């Protein structure tokens, strides 16, 4: 099993190139199932979840390859299989996005009930109910979600019960080939949804309102090919900004969009960071200072993102003062806190709220990653702690951060990946 060995007390300084957003690349890759002509995607990150998605698409009959420049090419013109199998789906909850384009274009699709990270309940109910509203017949059988439609999906007005990025994407993707007009109300507003809509429109879809809470889709008969560049990863950007903030450093994030990170940037400024933005860069300078504690409440976009909660929990554990962190999106998303406490952090958990009390320094320890964002907070903690830190189960990190140790080393971190030999 691979682990990270992190040597502490590094001040992180320098420049880092931000990768394409995994949370946009995944739905866009699945949406390419709709295309009757070849698609070319650039700025697609090299991640375990991307590799899994490409394997699922290949299983369905999509021809895929990466060229020498890193662009991903997809040809879904000869799809001949309509089942996303358990052995691939079990590692990634986003696999449910395969269902909508399959049933929309081919009138049938089966996806194994997905696995993925261990952040509480992430039910597929909203995906299913949305497809049913469009006319799909869905059964749960033998561990699979099986969807069929007689004739064609029919556009409807759909009010999503609880704001959901996944369900918004599923309904929007399915509705592109539905008959008539679909209106999604209480839609999620994340930039990754907007990027997916831009991609679909390039293929010939007629989508308006993405980025607002009402999205309108006028169904079309077919979708063609296109070229598209994935938007920058705002969560990776935020993660590196926090890395500089907790270490007293200065960082320039390049190839990113500050406009998608307003809530995070506001909190970093509250914590004492000096931040300057241009069209595609963000510069953060802590000028050697320790951050100030900031209260956090996670909310759907454009509120503070749940995917930045673990990183700010770490920031608050080494900040001046005490803070309150409220997690409103997912249950069971404080699993990093006991590990940070093992490193000398001080915090109490009460339901969906954590109370953090800043300490001057953390101490290196052996810690275990539990999910993607929790795991990166442990790596960053190791970068600033005294002594050495071993981070176990780093496969979580490989799901969402491209070349993470290379990027951190470029900023001055002392980090090595190693494989622990298992002795019988």
UniProtKB/Swiss-Prot annotation:
Subcellular location: Cytoplasm
Main location: cytoplasm
Keywords: Cell cycle, Cell division, Cell shape, Cell wall biogenesis/degradation, Cytoplasm, Peptidoglycan synthesis, Pyruvate, Transferase
Keyword Cell cycle appears in the UniProt entry: yes
Sequence positions that bind phosphoenolpyruvate: 22-23
Enzyme Commission code(s) on record: 2.5.1.7
Pathway(s) where this gene product acts: Cell wall biogenesis; peptidoglycan biosynthesis
Gene Ontology BP annotations: cell division; cell wall organization; peptidoglycan biosynthetic process; regulation of cell shape; UDP-N-acetylgalactosamine biosynthetic process
Positions contributing to UDP-N-acetyl-alpha-D-glucosamine binding: 93, 122-126, 162-165, 307, 329
A molecular function GO annotation: UDP-N-acetylglucosamine 1-carboxyvinyltransferase activity
Positions annotated as active site in the UniProt record: 117 (proton donor)
Catalyses which reaction(s): phosphoenolpyruvate + UDP-N-acetyl-alpha-D-glucosamine = UDP-N-acetyl-3-O-(1-carboxyvinyl)-alpha-D-glucosamine + phosphate
Residues with the 2-(S-cysteinyl)pyruvic acid O-phosphothioketal modification: 117
Matches recorded under InterPro entries: Enolpyruvate_Tfrase_dom, Enolpyruvate_Tfrase_sf, MurA_subfamily, RNA3'P_cycl/enolpyr_Trfase_a/b, UDP_GlcNAc_COvinyl_MurA
Source organism superkingdom: Bacteria
GO cellular component, one term: cytoplasm
The protein's role, per its UniProt record: Cell wall formation. Adds enolpyruvyl to UDP-N-acetylglucosamine.
Family statement drawn from the similarity comment of this UniProt entry: Belongs to the EPSP synthase family. MurA subfamily.
Protein name: UDP-N-acetylglucosamine 1-carboxyvinyltransferase
